[in-house]
């Protein structure tokens, strides 16, 4: 009964105006009132402030400053294996798995269209048909900066206007085509693992979506699709980001969807629905292992070569092998 009421509110409430109001309030500097709101938020959602660079809530001038707070450098170590792609966000796995032609799993018994998610861009959709996907939900308590799973060169960004449904598990299970309906920012990267899309999905109360290369993408909300492109390769004007580097952020929580081309990566076995994710942990592994070539030793001078041949071993073979 309660869930039915919550779902009804999703269709009845003026979500755009609520989002604008929340965004306005989150930008305001209100002194002691801002601190009070932050303290209540931290207590209600059990936010771990020990991970933040500034654990004292009094150090944040606005609620937005608190919400996009940076973490200490040591709390999210990034897996350095060149074959491993890492989690882009703190949160929980909503769904993950194979893209079946044009179908992506939203929740048990509910699929949505890959092409619709990509705003009808069938050329981009063709890159990912029968590939793999991971959907990560960021709850209000989570760190809300989004990072790169691997090194990447930005090729395209698309802003897609849309609804502002909540993107929690209740709505994912009950609102058809949720992620293809909501406002979103699609980022396409060239990577050593093939093309990768990282999609930032908006929601109710999400005041803005930002990227590190373009700043605030939304608002304003003008109701039209916008598209930007960048040159191929690392040339002047290109945007190249490193594995683990910040690429964007939400001001209030939402969802990140990653798309990978077929046959390029194998998703990590621990990716199960509702499993907790932390930035830097394994997301996927390359199907083609990259091996860093070992440098050949420099040739020895002739007298040293002769000395090596003449010398007797100083340790026995068994001890030398250890």
Curated annotation (Swiss-Prot):
Keywords: Cell membrane, Decarboxylase, Lipid biosynthesis, Lipid metabolism, Lyase, Membrane, Phospholipid biosynthesis, Phospholipid metabolism, Pyruvate, Zymogen. Is synthesized initially as an inactive proenzyme. Formation of the active enzyme involves a self-maturation process in which the active site pyruvoyl group is generated from an internal serine residue via an autocatalytic post-translational modification. Two non-identical subunits are generated from the proenzyme in this reaction, and the pyruvate is formed at the N-terminus of the alpha chain, which is derived from the carboxyl end of the proenzyme. It is a peripheral membrane protein. GO terms for cellular component: plasma membrane. It is found in: Cell membrane. Its cofactor is pyruvate. Its EC number is 4.1.1.65. Binds 1 pyruvoyl group covalently per subunit. Residues 306-322 have a biased composition (Basic and acidic residues). Residues 294-322 are annotated as: Disordered. The record marks 253-254 as: Cleavage (non-hydrolytic). The modification Pyruvic acid (Ser) is found at residue 254. One of its GO terms (molecular function) is phosphatidylserine decarboxylase activity. HAMAP family: PS_decarb_PSD_B_type1 (MF_00662). Belongs to the phosphatidylserine decarboxylase family. PSD-B subfamily. Prokaryotic type I sub-subfamily. This is Phosphatidylserine decarboxylase proenzyme.
């Amino acid at each position: 009964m309660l869930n039915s009421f919550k779902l009804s509110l999703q269709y009845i409430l003026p979500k755009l105006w609520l989002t604008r109001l929340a965004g306005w309030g989150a930008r305001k500097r209100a002194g002691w009132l801002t601190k009070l709101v932050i303290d209540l938020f931290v207590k209600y959602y059990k936010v771990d402030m020990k991970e933040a660079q500034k654990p004292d809530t009094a150090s944040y001038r606005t609620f937005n400053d608190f919400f996009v707070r940076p973490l200490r450098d040591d709390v999210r170590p990034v897996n350095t294996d060149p074959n491993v792609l890492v989690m882009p966000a703190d949160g929980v796995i909503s769904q993950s798995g194979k893209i079946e032609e044009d179908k992506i799993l939203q929740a048990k018994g509910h699929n949505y269209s890959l092409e619709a998610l990509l705003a009808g861009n069938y050329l981009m959709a063709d890159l990912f048909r029968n590939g793999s996907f991971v959907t990560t939900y960021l709850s209000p308590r989570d760190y809300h900066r989004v990072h790169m799973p691997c090194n990447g060169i930005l090729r395209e960004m698309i802003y897609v206007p849309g609804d502002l449904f909540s993107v929690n598990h209740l709505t994912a299970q009950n609102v058809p085509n949720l992620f293809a309906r909501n406002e979103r920012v699609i980022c396409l990267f060239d990577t050593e693992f093939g093309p990768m899309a990282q999609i930032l999905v908006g929601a109710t109360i999400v005041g803005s979506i930002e990227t590190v290369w373009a700043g605030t993408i939304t608002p304003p909300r003008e109701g039209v699709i916008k598209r930007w492109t960048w040159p191929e390769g690392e040339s002047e004007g290109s945007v190249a980001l490193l594995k683990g580097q910040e690429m964007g952020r939400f001001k209030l929580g939402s969802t990140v969807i990653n798309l990978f081309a077929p046959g390029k990566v194998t998703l990590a076995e621990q990716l199960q629905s509702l499993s907790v994710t932390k930035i830097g942990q394994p997301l996927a592994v390359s199907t083609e292992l990259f091996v860093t070539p070992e440098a050949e030793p420099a040739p020895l001078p002739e007298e040293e070569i002769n000395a090596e041949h003449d010398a007797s071993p100083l340790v026995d073979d068994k001890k030398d092998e250890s």
